[in-house]
Amino acid sequence: MAKVIVRKNESLDDALRRFKRGVSKDGTLQEYRKREFYVKPSVARKLKSEAAQKRNKKKGR
């Protein structure tokens, strides 16, 4: 969990920018989006397979 303590003489925008950087670095938002909806194991395998095929197709170019 990202935690930011606002420093003395620091603007709120700067603190918010540091918080956003911390959240993206931790991967908190990605984890939330991943767990937002339940994905059945069969669908997850299919998506993973399709992503691998797409990666391999890109590498072959």
From Swiss-Prot:
The lineage of its organism: Bacteria, Bacillati, Bacillota, Bacilli, Lactobacillales. It comes from the Bacteria. Belongs to the bacterial ribosomal protein bS21 family. The keyword Ribosomal protein applies. Keywords: Ribonucleoprotein, Ribosomal protein. It comes from Leuconostoc citreum (strain KM20). GO terms for molecular function: structural constituent of ribosome. NCBIfam families: S21p (TIGR00030). One of its GO terms (biological process) is translation. The keyword Signal does not apply. Pfam families: Ribosomal_S21. InterPro entries: Ribosomal_bS21 (IPR001911), Ribosomal_bS21_CS (IPR018278), Ribosomal_bS21_sf (IPR038380). This is Small ribosomal subunit protein bS21. GO terms for cellular component: ribonucleoprotein complex; ribosome.
